[in-house]
Amino acid sequence: MLISHSDLNQQLKSAGIGFNATELHGFLSGLLCGGLKDQSWLPLLYQFSNDNHAYPTGLVQPVTELYEKISQTLSDVEGFTFELGLTEDENVFAQADSLSDWANQFLLGLGLAQPKLAKEKGEIGEAVDDLQDICQLGYDEDDNEEELAEALEEIIEYVRTIAMLFYSHFNEEEIESKPVLH
């Protein structure tokens, strides 16, 4: 069974890792959406979240399971089952912060997997620009929470769609080689 968001957060914090569960999910999603297919994801994760040090043994398995789950949901292009690993906190302001954290780390992972990402044009280039804007997502504590929650829901759906767009674009050969089952 996949570790819960809060349990993963606790384990990361206890181990002194520089990512929370949301940031970890965003980073791993970015690597996968960028087309990374080999085992280099683990050294990259260590490099960017733990000063090049391996994670404690007890943390490697749940992180690997999360990576595999993200990979599985991303590859289900037809089912669109991919979800952003955002905070379980119901507070709309915490959700907005979580989305911003996720998007920041997603872009980092995506950029590592696709070093020429900044040169992308068209739909992909626009999606990168949109994600950069989402990273800067701001709100005022006086904002209407209901309106913010509605806007946030739309942005989250848009980010899910963008992630699938990147995955489809940078993993084209893999998607095309999968047999269509009827």
Curated annotation (Swiss-Prot):
Signal peptide annotation: none
InterPro entries associated with the record: YgfB-like (IPR011978), YgfB-like_sf (IPR036255)
Highest taxon in the source lineage: Bacteria
Gene3D superfamilies: YgfB uncharacterised protein family UPF0149, PF03695
GO cellular component, one term: cytosol
Entry's family note: Belongs to the UPF0149 family.
Protein name: UPF0149 protein CGSHiGG_07585
Organism encoding this protein: Haemophilus influenzae (strain PittGG)
